Amino acid sequence: MNLVVTALVKQVPKGDHSGRLDADGRLERAGAVAEMNPWCRRAVAQAVRLAGETGGRSTAITMGPAAAVDVLREALAWGVDDAVQLSDPALAGSDCLVTARALAATIRLLDDPPDLILVGNSSVDGSTGAVGAMLAELLGLPFTGPVLALEPADGRLRTTVQYDAGTESVTIDLPAVVAVAERSCDPAKAPADTWPSPDVVRQVTTADLAEGSWGLAASPTKVAQVHPAPLTRNPVIFRGHPQSQATRALAELTARGCFQQQSTPPRSGRQAAGEGSGAAPAPSEWTGLQVAAGQASRLPSTTPAPDGGAASRPLSTERRGAPRGEVVVLVGDGPVEGTRALLGAAAALAAEVGGVVTAVATEEGDREFARWGADSVVTLDGDEPRAVARALTGWLQGRGAWAVLGAALPWDREVLARLAVTSDAGLMSDLVSLSAKEGRLSGLKPSGGGTLAEIISRGTPQIATLRTGLLPLRTPRDDRPLEPQTLHVEPDTAIFRTERRTGSDGDALDRAEVVIGVGRGVPPEKYDELEPVRLLLNAELAATRKVTDQGWLPHGRQIGITGRSVAPRMYLAVGLSGNLNHLAGASRAGTVVAINTDPAAEIFAHCDVGLVADWQEVMPYLVDGLRSCVSG
């Protein structure tokens, strides 16, 4: 089979961008040095490989301003046969749904319909991870990803899909849309002096597309404002002999209460997630999705902190006025603690807007879901994302649902991205908090330059995915039975799944009290030297994107804008520079401790306690001191 392969590529700012908005409310990118998105480099490399190996043809498409032609020139230099740029001022401010529509319309202009459309799994400037699935829905195609390996066979594509907790073998019918993982291959990088002239790129405007509405005005979601991340930490930096630094740092951490009695880390399983709760305390009305106590100072006022600890705040049984709609929560096979936190967040929102919570789940769990916040439960009898989205589309018609929420995980992302297309509602993706503002949903997500972008939606229903590791666990309410309901889901014969392999316990990061983050300054053969401090602190190991890209730690251990977000009691950053895209994932840590040999490293501006030292020299002294701190 001579494969016709199309790779979608995006130009992104190189490094951190400012996060500022222009006069029209769009993220300001003028003057920033730009490059091809790292994930898109893999899509280009795979497109060239597959087309070359099968005697086919490859095309690269980008949507962006005139300067974005450079990513196509680089793709052509790498070996892509054709390139198309969609560029029009009318497209400025397009959200992911309008972007997907414009790209779908551009693909329909191609002389040869593609057998395979490759997209990067994410982007360093937005991390929606939704355009690929939206594009698949618009084109009526199956979707899978992020894939580590892909090979054509008899009109189908055999892939290995990467998840936080391992991999899965997936075979998918062609034509299809596939998201490419960053570790799938070496990136397509060509020296600028080898790029061809821009004249060889085919130029397309909205006038060439089928009739449609474009740009910010047509987008159901938008960035309302960008909140700067204030430097709320007051770093205490130590220098000198490693032993002296360790002694002084431990004294500072002890004074901060960092070594007070640690609670037992949450165990997996629904029983553990709700164990020991007993009867619910007296009802206490929620006023929106809250963050853990003591962490609100690092967030705008849209997410007020509760009076008590995050794990002790009870679920509310009160509703304000007559129900005006419902908050639907999509429950897949993600971490149990994440499901509990998400249902609690939904109950908070429902209390705010006078609604109810309906859990739509792939497996039965009526009693647990009810205790965690659900007022009703619907069980799906199938779990293929495309088919689930179709079933939900029909089920939601006429219900007047106020919002549909899911976790920021691959299954939830695909279902809700497809639902965003069929409902014309758009998607707010990878949010770290939610609130109700004037009866509408508002969410925050990490943006460039260490900022938080406030996203709003005018769609109906309002659809969002959340990073559940940052949501508080609420005390379950009284056990009560719910009437079982079932929603039929048709099978999807275009996709076949086999052999799911578990390779990572990255989900443990979501509720870890202490996290040790490692950068490239800690080579993998030295990880054993971190074991004593990890065991003493009962900590989980995490990493920067560059570490996981190199395969030193599993992808599920990555923290940052394009990885996980955590809120531990203490975050120990070892051998990492402090890139703001990484620190966005640990911004809600109670105390940040940094160890780096470079006194000018960015991490020292965003920590509470810093040690200017070689981690291998200072760590033995820290371990010796920690033994008495922890035991005491």
What are the functions of these language-model segments?
Residues 1-632:
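N-terminal glycine-rich FAD/FM-binding segment characteristic of electron-transfer flavoproteins
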